[in-house]
Regions:
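Extracellular beta-strand-rich solenoid/capping regions of secreted or surface-exposed proteins
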Residues: 2, 6-14, 26-42, 50-70, ...
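Solvent-exposed adhesion/ligand-recognition segments of exported proteins
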Residues: 3, 18-21
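Generic beta-sheet signal
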Residues: 16-18, 117
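Short His-Asn-centered micro-motif
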Residues: 21, 54, 171-172
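Right-handed parallel beta-helix
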Residues: 38, 43, 64-75, 93-106, ...
Length: 183
């Protein structure tokens, strides 16, 4: 509705910064798929305990110049079935993206999946506790973070990848010779 995270991130156009007057948990009713550019989600503006997104994933798709800061994503497997096994955060074919101070956990497939991005930064974040025995069609899964087919520079620094079975993180599949800075 009016003034919501979804309205600001999906329906508005042009450069914008989303700020929060309240803190709390946003129970998504569907995935938050962001296909707009020039967006900052400033979670640090929320008072008190900050902002948590739960029940559905955050998906950046063909976006550019996006900054997301100080946000928690707790996917979980509520209302999920075997063919619906998302990651907490997916970033597909985006450029100039910064994820900063993100805490993500309880992904059905994994915590984070990035593919085909240019100038991507993940910093000061915690990705942990993917669900191992959940509703994933392959059975036990619990992957952490995957950075696939980067097209250009990628910076992954000062992060914690923990308490998942695999991909702590996995980087690969590039068709070019990008620079990777991993700390």
């Amino acid at each position: 509705g009016r003034g919501s995270l979804r309205e600001g991130a999906i329906t508005r156009n042009g450069p914008r910064t989303i700020v929060f007057d309240l803190s709390g948990t946003i129970e998504l009713k569907s995935p938050l798929v962001i296909e707009k550019s020039h967006l900052t989600i400033a979670g640090q503006t929320a008072p008190g305990d900050g902002i948590t997104i739960k029940d559905y994933n955050l998906h950046l798709k063909k976006s550019s110049h996006v900054i997301i800061r100080y946000l928690r994503v707790r996917l979980g497997d509520r209302n999920k079935q075997g063919d619906d096994a998302p990651d907490c955060i997916t970033v597909d074919y985006c450029d100039n993206v910064i994820l900063d101070h993100i805490s993500a956990s309880w992904g059905v497939d994994g915590i984070q999946d990035t593919r085909g991005c240019t100038n991507y930064t993940l910093q000061w974040s915690i990705f942990s506790e993917a669900l191992n025995n959940s509703v994933h069609p392959k059975g036990a899964h619990a992957m952490c973070a995957s950075f696939r087919a980067p097209l250009s520079n990628m910076s992954i620094h000062h992060n914690i990848f923990a308490s998942s079975r695999d991909r702590h993180p996995t980087i690969g599949g590039s068709v070019q010779d990008p620079q990777w800075i991993v700390d």
